[in-house]
Amino acid sequence: MMKSESESYKAAGVDITAGYASVELMKKHVARTMTAGCVEGIGGFGGLFALDAAGMEEPVLVSGTDGVGTKLKIAMLLDKHDTIGIDCVAMCVNDVICCGAKPLFFLDYIACGKNVPEKIASIVAGVAEGCVQAESALIGGETAEHPGMMPEDDYDLAGFSVGIVDKKRIINSETVRPGDVMLALPSTGVHSNGFSLVRKVFAIGNGGENRNYPELDKPLWETLLTPTKIYVKPVLALLKEIQPKAISHITGGGFYENIPRSLPEGCCAKIKKSDVRVLPIFDLIAREGSVPERDMFNTFNMGVGMTITVAREDADKALAILHQNGEPGAYVLGEIVAGEKGVELW
């Protein structure tokens, strides 16, 4: 098929042929994500997916969309783009599974100042890896070149995930009661939130990214670019055996904003601070930036990427399932008590 070209459009800053090259380079990455529901490959006007709702009485679709935020600035600074797509997928699918839904498919959106095919392919390679981890098909996406609106080296990345759950299995806060137990799934680090503060604390962009700290087992930049953990597989394994009462993805706003989102009125999550397994990077941020403890717990995940609330009698079984399915570090974080809706850290 003859490809279209526009020298005039290229002179204005949009290179159509670079777009074609990007698509060709990313095809092998997208192919890794294909699942039984995929109907066609990429390149059409819409992504097609055949829905299999077998065994569900009332199938409900669940959607989630998010981006990576200013963590992208570090990826751009270091010209390392192959893992940032994992973050994008994680931010979306981890939200979807909080409802008890199995992610089905994913789409990405990249806006850039200049389409450099190799860079775009590297970004999409990360998105594809995230989709593989989430057992979700990458069925489409968009790369938009924005000359004059964005600097040539800049880009933004966002994603969109769709999952499915039987209506009777939807997880919400309605059944949470005092006496329930809250479990913690450890994070891999800062994940994808709080990076505006992180960049300020460490003077990222002014050489701070290259510093080494004895409490970190790798250079600072590598610690900060560690991808957000994807919790899909362990949570789906848990859902086969136990119906959790609530799940919270600990993102922007930390404990104080995200945990209450999965609590009903009259219930408070009581957590002993010494029981939180805080990762070294957070102690380092607090020390280097003189950040108050309250602000730390109100900004970062502090080493807890996801919380799962279960009935007390299900706690041991839930931990065993998580330990056997990729979350050996899962632990009891706290309990639900009667009180004002919120979080009590003591």
Model segments located where?
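Buried hydrophobic packing segments
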Residues: 22, 26, 48, 92-93, ...
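Short, acidic (Asp/Glu-rich) active-site segment that either coordinates a divalent metal cofactor
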Residues: 156, 169-220
